[in-house]
Amino acid sequence: MNKELKNNPFKVHGIEHFSPSMINTFVNDPVLFILKYVYKHKGYSNSSAVRGHTVEKVLNQYLDNKQLITEDEIKGLFTSMVSDAQYNCDKDELKSDKYSKELGLLNDYYNVGVDFLSADDWFFAKPTGYQNQIIINDDDFPIPIMGYIDFIFDDKIVDLKTSGKMPSKLTENIYRQMAIY
């Protein structure tokens, strides 16, 4: 059970939990954190953010049935997700250069993921979990930390990252996320 505070600022501002993303936002840009989580200013998402969700979904489909998904199916899913109000993309996102660029790269991200997840020395079984919620309660902190692990295997977890460049070293954001998971 979490510690109950008098004049709990989290309760006052409707913050029921932290996530790895929220913690990273606070560390990297406290003003953005205040805008998003205190003042509830919801900025628009974009094609790059939706790309990650799209690749995650199609890789999960691949892992479930070991059948490749066509490039047209991937692009169709991406387009429908960018258009979906849940992802909160700007209404003009489908006309943007960023959207066209991401659309053209989707199949490459998917193929890299399939190659990695199909390597004989790494992957032999279906994941035992997908988008599994974790909750960390600390008696000294008034709200829990909550996150979702993309893929769970018997002896590994995978948090999918899609990026145009392979970083030479892991970022502090990723280290914080790894510490939570």
Predicted feature locations:
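Accessory terminal regions of nucleic-acid processing enzymes
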Residues: M1, N60, P142-M146
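Terminal, charged accessory segments of proteins
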Residues: M1-V27
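Short amphipathic alpha-helical segments and their helix-coil junctions
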Residues: P9-I15, P30-K42, I157, K161-S163
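Short, flexible loop/turn motifs enriched in small residues
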Residues: S19, N28, P144-Y148
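Nuclease catalytic cores
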Residues: P20-L68
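A non-catalytic, helix-rich entry segment at domain boundaries
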Residues: V58-N137
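Mg2+/Mn2+-dependent nuclease catalytic core
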Residues: A125-P127, N132-Y181
